[in-house]
Each structure stands twice: as structure tokens, then as C-alpha cells.
């Protein structure tokens, strides 16, 4: 029996689905978020604040819901962060689209917005809107990120040129990350554990390759132990394999190891050949030859000081016996991932047993510091002291917990943190090129790599250097009226004159380092000057492909970084703007990228900043599609800090926080953050683009077909009918 239901694809249908998902994840957002209890069909109970785990645990029937969760999962596999924010932002975007296209007149919208809404409603096709979203992502977002948001970026590095990592900044980043994914009683401990692991595994020359290694092999680098408190979790030097020795022989001194991917014992015949036995005597002779050959190979390994044999396959009993006789420990049946991890750490190729016996030296061996069994709560493991040939220093994480489910949550959170750091420590190329025409090197045009179009950049600052925030009331009534108009028209927030005139920036904890070996009290500000200068610029306007082919001709230009200091009682400050240095040229082109290590204080700063600059762009844009997309995205961005501040009251509430931010931006004053945590700018950017891509997929759906099938009958394979 087959039944089907056909429904027209629409924003309203997608919004209804997204709102259900939003109701689930919004209650566990931020440090004040609660844990959600889920009961799976198997009877398993899941108690978690991890948005990705909650969404994957849901039993979803609606096709759009499954598609949204698939988009979230794809995003998490790359970035490890943002599942709950993904759903909230997507839901607010759908609300904005639905409100614009469904309402003829909205009293909260200005006349310009209503005109653009009618224009879009007349388009009558969602695919037109989806194309405008793609245009926004590739041609508008990157320019605003680099030209305006970059003025507020902080660096997690204590030295931006040498990329020296500041431990205190990393702790702030990790604490903010784990507070939304791990229980309140454990998130600081897990954050400290992660920070310790990071610095124990890294060398001074460590690069992005170490993050890639830990991300790719995180399952092999951690061990879960149930029945113990979380506080018993620790870091162990060396590699812990979740296997036991097939034979263990204690060894001292130099220990050499070999890796084999096939049986050491010779076979009767090789692949593709035939071995014929005509009598029992021939069989016995062949068996004796194999035994002698195996014994000779193991003796030869022993003579080369090989005391450990790592095997990805099951070895015959004869190999195990002669290994024990010759004092060689054997670990077998390792997974391909475990063997690959060992090979990447020590740079060792597999040992291939020779067809003809030889006394020559075995080249494929590696030194090991130690090789011993490790017992964790009555279970035996293999503990190896590998000598690394790469920038990664082998360490394993032992995660303890009373239940397996809690351990899995901590594993997911730690793995996601490494994914986040992997993206944070990479430069992110932006999809446009800026043109400078004046003597001061001021950027005037956005020239995009994927398009021949150029856009005039809106001017929103006077280029002055940051200054401390002062506890003063607003004296300029014109400025006050301008701020109120901005709030009413663009943000649907109505605040009285008294509230706006008398608000006082509140005190916040200062950002001070807590490590013992580093005393960095400032965070480096990465400004607009970190762009790359392209000498060979003329063909860029003629052929888009030249922008990539001339990448090797670009010259890195270093500039002195501004410093963000902490003023006692004033909170942590973000720079408002900075001046471009004189490049000494009348015309040049800059290919922009977001440098590694860019962060912002948590608490909705990224969303409020991008909201503000998008609205400024929309006011000066003459294309109705671009204006409407910018307005919708700008207003949807505020949905995230609204959820974060929903439990706050008074001067800590979202309206007051938003007023302070807008007033600071309009008066060219530094922003003051009420929280000390940090979050990755790269992660925020990737989240925004992932949501826009998901929304584009939703808007291109014309028809939703739900197919329901009756459960198929399961036949017993041993039934008489089948026999």
C-alpha cells in the first residue's frame, strides 16, 4: 500500500517546521540555557545542551525538517559549532521573508520597506529571492565583513605577526564555547582539560596540520571510562590504544617497533598461484617449512632490537608463539584509523616480510620510549610512548563519567572545539577585491572575484582611533533624536527619552590572564591594514581567473597592530575604527582575507555589529533586491542576541544593550562588552553563510511529496518456504 501527500513548497510551511525546532533548541542557548531531556524510540534517555545531538536525536517525518537537520549536521562536521544559532537565525530569516511577502502594510515598516515588499511580492517566485541571497553572500557580505566589522576584531594571538598564542585568551574562548554545550557543573573543568591538552600537544612550530590531525583522529586520541566521576578525567602522555596485548613481553632500553598490514607467517601460495599437495608427507614438509620461516623472521626482528609488533590483521598462533619466545610484544587487529594515526605521528611505513630470508637491516622500524599495559577501571589498554616526527606531541585524553551518555556528550563537545579551532587558525579568503584611488589608500570600491560589478562602499566612520568610554549623559539632542529614529525604524525598539539619556555603561570584569608562564594583558586588534597588496593589478578587471593565477605575485605587507586594553570599571573595549596607512600610490588593488585568530566578545556582538553595518548599507543601496535582502538579514541577526538576553532585566536587557551598542557606533566610541568570553569570527561567518545556503535550498522547493509506506514483513530466513 502506497499513499502520498503533495503540498506546495512555501516559506510558511518551512517556517512552521523551523519554529518547532526553534522551540526545542532556544531553551538551551547561552550560559543561562537549560538541558533538554529526550527519550529515544529505543528507550534511551538523552539529557543534553548540545544542539547537534538534540537535533540528530529527533525522529523527524517532515522532509523539510530532515533537510534542515541535514544542513545543520553538514555545518557541524566542518565547523563544530553553531547548531542552535543555526536554527534560530534560519527561523528569523523565514519570519522576515514571510512578513515581507505576506503583508501589504505593516505599521512598523517604513514606506521604503513597503515599496520593496510589494516589488518582491510581484516577482511571485521564491527562486528570485534565493538568487538575491546568493548574490548577497558572494558580493555584499564579504565586503562589509572586511571593510567594517574588521575594525572591531580582536586577535587570540599575543603577537599577530608571529602568531604567538595567548593562553588566557584561549581559556576565554574555550570557556565560552563549552558553557553552551556542557553542564554548568562541568564546563569549566572540561574547558581547562581542553586547554591543557592543547598546550601539551603543541610545539613552538605547530601549525594548522596539528589541528587537522587531532580533528581527523579524535576518536583514536580519547578513551572513555564509565563508572568514575568526571573530575577523574585526565591527560596521559603517549598514545593509548583501545586494545590489549596479544602477547606482552616487558622490555627495557631501546625499543623498536614495526607495523605490519598482513600476516607475518608465510602462506602456502601467493595470490593468483596454485599450490598442489599430493601426499601427507608433502603437507607435513610444507608445514615444517612455514614454521621454520616464521621462526627465522621473528628471530631476525629480535636481532634488530624490534620488541613491538603492531598489526592491523589477526596474526596466526604460530606468529604469536614465536613472538613470545623472542621477547616481542604483539598488538593486533588495530583499525585502519589507528594504524594511520601511528604512521602519521612517527612517519613509519609498514614492514613487509621478505619472500627470501635475509640478514640485512630492517629499514621500517621506529624507536618507542615505552610500551606497557594500562589498566583503567579493570580494562586493559596498550600504552605507547611514541617519538613524534611531526609537530604533534602524542597525548591521549581519558574522559571519565558515571554514564556512557555523559562521556559521549563530552567527547562531542571536545571534538567540536577542535573543529572550531581548526577553522579559527586558518586564514579565510574573501570573495572580493578592493580598489584604492586616493593617496591615503582609502578603499572606495568593492570589486568581486566572482563578478565584474563594483559597489561604492558606504562611509560610516571618520577614521579616528579608539578612546575610552566616558560615563556621560547624551547632551546632543539631535544625536539623541537620530538614535531614537534609528531604533524605531530599523529595530522595532521604542525607548523613552529618559532611558536613553540617563543610561550609564556598567562595570564588567577585566580580561586578565590566569596562566603562570605568560603575562599578556592586552588583546591585539587586527585592523583593516592586513590586506594583501597585488602588484599585478591591471588584468584583474579584465579576467576574473587572473585574480587566482597571480596569487604567487602578492606581497605580504605587515602593519603595526592597535592594542585593546582593559580599563578598570569600564569593561572590555572594542576598537571603533582605525586609519589606513599611506601606501604611496595613486591606485592599487587589495585582495582581502580574514586573518587567522580573529575573535569578538560573546553576547551578540557579532550580530549587532553586522546588523548595524547592513542597515547602513541598505540605506545607501539603490537596488531593491539587495536592499530588501540586507534588511531581512540585518533584522534576523538580532534574533540571536534577543534569545541570549531574554532572561536579563534592567540595564542588562537586550534593548539597553542594543541602545548602548548603536549609540557607541554612531558616536564613534568603543563598544563595551558585559561578558569576558570570546568567540570565533570565522565560525560566525561560516554559520551565516551555511544558513543562507540552507535558506536558498528551502526557497527552491516547489513541491513537497511525503511518501508513507507500510512496514515490510520480515521473513525468517530459515523458514521451510525458503528452504
Curated annotation (Swiss-Prot):
Compartments (UniProt record): Cell projection, Cilium
GO terms for MF: ATP binding
Family under the similarity heading: Belongs to the TCP-1 chaperonin family.
GO cellular component: cilium
Gene3D superfamilies assigned to the protein according to its UniProt record, in alphabetical order: GroEL, GroEL-like equatorial domain, TCP-1-like chaperonin intermediate domain
Keywords: ATP-binding, Cell projection, Chaperone, Cilium, Nucleotide-binding
Job description of the protein: Probable molecular chaperone that assists the folding of proteins upon ATP hydrolysis. Plays a role in the assembly of BBSome, a complex involved in ciliogenesis regulating transports vesicles to the cilia. Involved in adipogenic differentiation.
Organism, scientific name: Pongo abelii
Pfam families on file: Cpn60_TCP1
Self-association and partners: Component of a complex composed at least of MKKS, BBS10, BBS12, TCP1, CCT2, CCT3, CCT4, CCT5 and CCT8.
BP terms from Gene Ontology: chaperone-mediated protein complex assembly
Protein name (Swiss-Prot/TrEMBL): BBSome complex assembly protein BBS10
Amino acid at each position: 500500500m502506497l499513499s502520498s501527500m503533495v503540498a506546495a513548497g512555501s516559506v510558511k510551511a518551512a517556517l512552521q517546521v523551523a519554529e518547532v525546532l526553534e522551540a526545542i533548541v532556544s531553551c538551551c542557548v547561552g550560559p543561562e540555557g537549560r538541558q533538554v531531556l529526550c527519550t529515544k524510540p529505543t528507550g534511551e534517555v538523552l539529557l543534553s545542551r548540545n544542539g547537534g545531538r538534540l537535533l540528530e536525536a529527533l525522529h523527524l517525518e517532515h522532509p523539510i525538517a530532515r533537510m534542515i537537520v541535514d544542513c545543520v549536521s553538514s555545518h557541524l562536521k566542518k565547523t563544530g559549532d553553531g547548531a542552535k544559532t543555526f536554527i534560530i537565525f534560519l527561523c528569523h530569516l523565514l519570519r522576515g521573508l514571510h512578513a515581507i511577502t505576506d503583508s501589504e502594510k505593516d505599521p512598523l515598516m517604513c514606506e521604503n520597506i513597503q515599496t520593496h515588499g510589494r516589488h518582491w511580492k510581484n516577482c511571485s517566485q521564491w527562486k528570485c529571492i534565493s538568487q538575491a541571497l546568493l548574490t548577497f553572500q558572494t558580493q555584499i557580505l564579504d565586503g562589509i565583513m572586511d571593510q567594517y566589522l574588521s575594525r572591531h576584531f580582536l586577535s587570540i594571538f599575543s603577537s599577530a605577526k608571529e602568531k604567538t598564542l595567548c593562553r588566557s585568551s584561549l581559556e576565554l574562548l574555550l570557556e565560552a564555547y563549552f558553557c553552551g554545550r556542557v553542564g554548568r557543573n562541568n564546563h569549566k573543568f572540561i574547558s581547562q582539560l581542553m586547554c591543557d591538552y592543547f598546550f601539551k600537544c603543541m610545539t613552538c612550530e605547530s601549525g594548522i596540520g596539528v589541528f587537522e590531525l587531532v580533528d581527523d583522529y579524535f576518536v583514536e586520541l580519547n578513551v572513555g571510562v564509565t563508572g568514575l566521576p568526571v573530575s577523574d578525567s585526565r591527560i596521559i602522555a603517549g598514545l593509548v590504544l583501545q586494545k590489549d596485548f596479544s602477547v606482552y613481553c616487558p622490555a627495557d632500553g631501546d625499543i623498536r617497533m614495526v607495523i605490519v598490514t598482513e600476516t607475518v607467517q608465510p602462506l602456502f601460495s601467493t595470490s593468483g598461484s596454485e599450490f598442489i599437495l599430493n601426499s601427507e608427507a608433502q603437507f607435513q614438509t610444507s608445514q615444517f617449512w612455514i614454521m621454520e620461516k616464521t621462526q627465522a623472521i621473528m628471530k631476525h626482528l629480535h636481532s634488530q632490537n624490534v620488541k613491538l609488533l603492531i598489526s592491523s590483521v589477526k596474526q596466526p598462533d604460530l606468529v604469536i608463539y614465536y613472538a613470545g619466545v623472542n621477547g616481542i610484544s604483539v598488538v593486533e587487529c588495530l583499525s585502519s584509523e589507528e594504524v594511520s594515526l601511528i604512521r602519521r605521528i612517527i612517519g613509519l611505513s609498514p614492514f613487509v616480510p621478505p619472500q627470501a630470508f635475509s640478514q640485512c637491516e630492517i629499514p621500517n622500524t621506529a624507536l618507542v620510549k615505552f610500551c606497557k599495559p594500562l589498566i583503567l577501571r579493570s580494562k586493559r589498554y596498550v600504552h605507547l610512548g611514541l617519538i613524534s616526527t611531526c609537530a604533534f606531541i602524542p597525548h591521549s585524553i581519558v574522559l571519565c563519567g558515571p554514564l556512557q551518555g555523559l562521556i559521549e556528550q563530552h567527547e562531542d563537545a571536545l571534538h567540536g572545539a577542535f573543529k572550531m579551532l581548526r577553522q579559527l587558525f586558518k586564514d579565510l579568503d574573501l570573495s572580493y577585491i578592493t580598489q584604492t584611488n586616493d593617496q591615503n589608500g582609502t578603499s572606495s570600491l568593492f570589486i568581486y572575484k566572482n563578478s565584474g560589478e563594483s559597489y561604492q562602499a558606504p562611509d560610516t566612520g571618520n577614521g579616528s582611533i579608539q578612546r575610552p568610554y566616558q560615563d556621560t549623559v547624551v547632551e546632543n539632542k539631535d544625536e539623541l533624536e537620530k538614535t531614537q529614529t534609528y531604533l524605531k525604524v530599523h529595530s522595532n525598539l521604542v525607548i523613552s527619552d529618559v532611558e536613553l539619556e540617563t543610561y550609564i555603561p556598567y562595570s564588567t570584569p577585566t580580561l586578565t590572564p590566569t596562566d603562570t608562564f605568560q603575562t599578556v594583558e592586552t588583546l591585539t586588534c587586527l585592523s583593516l591594514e592586513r590586506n594583501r597588496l597585488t602588484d599585478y593589478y591591471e588584468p584583474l578587471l579584465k579576467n576574473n581567473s587572473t585574480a587566482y593565477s597571480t596569487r604567487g605575485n602578492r606581497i605580504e605587507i605587515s602593519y603595526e597592530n592597535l592594542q585593546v586594553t582593559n580599563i578598570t570599571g569600564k569593561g572590555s573595549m572594542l576598537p571603533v575604527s582605525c586609519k589606513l596607512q599611506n601606501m604611496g600610490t595613486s591606485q592599487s588593488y587589495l585582495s582581502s582575507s580574514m586573518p587567522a585568530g580573529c575573535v569578538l566578545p560573546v553576547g551578540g556582538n557579532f550580530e549587532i555589529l553586522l546588523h548595524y553595518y547592513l542597515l547602513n548599507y541598505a540605506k545607501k543601496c539603490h537596488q531593491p533586491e539587495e536592499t530588501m535582502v540586507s534588511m531581512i538579514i540585518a533584522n534576523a541577526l538580532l534574533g540571536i542576541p534577543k534569545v541570549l538576553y531574554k532572561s536579563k532585566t534592567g540595564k542588562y536587557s537586550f534593548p539597553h544593550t542594543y541602545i548602548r551598542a548603536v549609540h557607541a557606533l554612531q558616536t564613534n566610541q568603543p563598544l563595551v562588552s558585559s561578558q569576558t568570553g570570546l568567540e570565533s569570527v570565522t565560525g560566525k561567518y561560516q554559520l551565516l553563510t551555511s544558513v543562507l545556503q540552507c535558506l536558498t535550498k528551502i526557497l527552491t522547493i516547489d513541491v513537497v511529496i511525503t511518501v508513507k509506506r507500510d512496514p515490510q514483513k520480515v521473513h525468517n530466513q530459515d523458514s521451510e518456504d525458503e528452504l
